[in-house]
Swiss-Prot record:
Family, per entry: Belongs to the DAD/OST2 family.
GO biological process, any: protein glycosylation
UniProt entry keywords in alphabetical sequence: Apoptosis, Endoplasmic reticulum, Membrane, Transmembrane, Transmembrane helix
Name of the featured protein: Dolichyl-diphosphooligosaccharide--protein glycosyltransferase subunit DAD2
Aminoacyl-tRNA synthetase found in the keyword field: no
Predominant localisation class: endoplasmic reticulum
Length: 115
């Protein structure tokens, strides 16, 4: 059995970093948006754990809004990525329009859930 060393881990992180630096800027912006949405959901969960979740519908709506938006942004990233062969025929404008429309539907459902 081969033991992994810290050099292997450093090589892995170096190769991941060098591959990510080659990523186009528009995909990096989408990645930043996804990280922000997930971070916001984590802040809401931490707040709920510390303070409580008295209006549970509000807490649930906020977390589901953040996670749903992050999932839709990941779908946008998949569709906009030029190296993805499944969506070669899809224009980036169409993918962004789908993202906006799905976000609108998501937030209408969340507002309806709030009551």
């Amino acid at each position: 059995m081969v033991k992994s060393t810290s050099k292997d881990a450093q090589d892995l992180f170096h190769s991941l970093h060098s591959a990510y630096t080659a990523t186009p800027t528009n995909l990096k912006i989408i990645d930043l948006y996804v990280c922000f949405a997930v971070f916001t959901a984590l802040i809401q969960v931490a707040y709920m754990a510390l303070v409580g979740s008295f209006p549970f519908n509000s807490f649930l709506s906020g977390v589901l809004s953040c996670i749903g938006t992050a999932v839709l942004a990941v779908c946008l990233r998949i569709q906009v990525n030029k190296e993805n062969k499944e969506f070669k025929d899809l224009a980036p404008e169409r993918a962004f329009a789908d993202f906006v429309l799905c976000n609108l539907v998501l937030h209408l459902v969340i507002i309806n859930f709030l009551g």
